């Protein structure tokens, strides 16, 4: 079973968000939440929320399909950050000049899945 959550237009730079996402990729979902809760990076909060949302989505899918659900079985199978639209702002400078400031945004995607049981042959 696979469940997905996407947060779009998050006001954090993709490079900083990728640093946090790389910490939790491949881990169990509960372990990832524990790491994100105490991570010092500001990007850990939106990633935490997306992981929580993916777990909730998995719970809803399991209830809908009538499958037994155990949160401890979920692993983060995919996690990636794409670049969102960039907001362009201007900072006034001396002698009538202006410097451009790029406020970058991110699209954070997390997919949680239950590990496939190997069939006995």
From Swiss-Prot:
InterPro entries (UniProt xref): Ribosomal_uL22, Ribosomal_uL22_bac/chlpt-type, Ribosomal_uL22_bac/org-type, Ribosomal_uL22_CS, Ribosomal_uL22_sf
GO term, biological process aspect, one: translation
Gene Ontology MF terms in the entry: rRNA binding; structural constituent of ribosome
GO cellular component: a single term: cytosolic large ribosomal subunit
Keyword RNA-binding recorded: yes
Superkingdom of source: Bacteria
Keyword terms, alphabetized: Ribonucleoprotein, Ribosomal protein, RNA-binding, rRNA-binding
UniProt key word Transcription regulation: no
Subunit structure: Part of the 50S ribosomal subunit.
HAMAP family, per database record: Ribosomal_uL22_B
Family that this chain belongs to: Belongs to the universal ribosomal protein uL22 family.
Function: This protein binds specifically to 23S rRNA; its binding is stimulated by other ribosomal proteins, e.g. L4, L17, and L20. It is important during the early stages of 50S assembly. It makes multiple contacts with different domains of the 23S rRNA in the assembled 50S subunit and ribosome.
Listed name of the protein: Large ribosomal subunit protein uL22
Source organism (scientific name): Pseudarthrobacter chlorophenolicus (strain ATCC 700700 / DSM 12829 / CIP 107037 / JCM 12360 / KCTC 9906 / NCIMB 13794 / A6)
